[in-house]
From Swiss-Prot:
GO terms for molecular function: DNA binding. Pfam families: SfsA, SfsA_N. InterPro entries: SfsA, SfsA_C, SfsA_N. HAMAP family: SfsA. Belongs to the SfsA family. This is Sugar fermentation stimulation protein homolog. It comes from the Bacteria.
């Protein structure tokens, strides 16, 4: 799984209005890129950081560029495009990378479910032995000393998803919280109790109720270190629920 076209490198000037980022290209040109991330992006927007943009030739688009990657510190990459994780997770599942979710015949996206009117990211069905698996995907980019934390801001929506997953377990199905680790410096994932204590509490309750929690890290760079290379998930990362 790769970017469809080579990315364009630049330097971050600023992010503003949540969805916009000004970037200076190598020739000195300044462009405004779409920032497809509604979170705080804590730790992922250092001043003058190296960033990589995808480019669209669609004349109907208001902004030609989309912010994809950032170098959070020398040699460490993060993918800030929150549109990517669902496709990354699905590709890994269908390729057999995620052993705990292997053997399902069908994968559907954005299926309506639950009493709180949610949409599940991925619904796996058609397994010979296991019940259907409801998979909620979350992007992890907040890193502190090798630890990855989720969420990076208080998330009532994320809390709702945990309640919905617990309900699916009660209904007799599998429910899975899938952390896509889009940061090459993260070695372990844990709940960000210091940011959203309620989310951490609910996550632990969900695990006790039977919700499965897994995490896989993306490559983000090719074998030659080219940051416009690989998006595929390549390695499972441990999850710790200790406070």
């Amino acid at each position: 799984m790769k970017f469809s076209e080579p990315l364009v490198e630049g330097r971050l000037i600023r992010r503003y209005k949540r969805f916009l980022a000004d970037v200076q290209l190598p020739d000195g040109t300044e462009v405004t890129a779409h920032c497809p991330n509604t979170g705080s992006m804590l730790g992922c927007q250092p001043e003058n950081a190296r960033v990589w943009l995808s480019r669209s030739d669609n004349p109907k688009r208001k902004l030609q560029y989309t912010w994809e990657l950032v170098e959070t510190e020398p040699g460490v990459l993060a993918c800030v495009n929150t549109v990517r994780p669902n496709a990354q997770a699905r590709a890994a599942i269908e390729a057999g990378v995620v052993q705990s979710l292997a053997g399902y015949a069908q994968c559907r996206a954005e299926v309506r479910y639950g009493s709180e009117k949610s949409r599940i990211d991925l619904l796996l069905s058609g397994h010979d032995h296991d019940p259907d698996a409801w998979v909620e995907v979350k992007n992890v980019t907040l890193a502190e000393g090798g630890e990855g934390y989720f969420p990076d801001a208080v998330t009532e929506r994320g809390q709702k998803h945990l309640r919905e997953l617990m309900a699916q377990v009660q209904n007799g199905d599998r429910a899975v919280l899938f952390f896509v680790v889009n940061h090459t410096g993260i070695e372990q994932v844990r709940p960000a109790d210091h940011i959203d204590a309620r989310y951490g509490q609910l996550l632990r309750e969900a695990c006790e109720a039977g919700v499965e929690v897994i995490a896989y890290r993306a490559a983000l760079a090719g074998e030659d270190g080219d940051p416009s290379g690989r998006l595929e998930l390549v390695e499972e990362v441990p999850v710790s629920l200790e406070p």
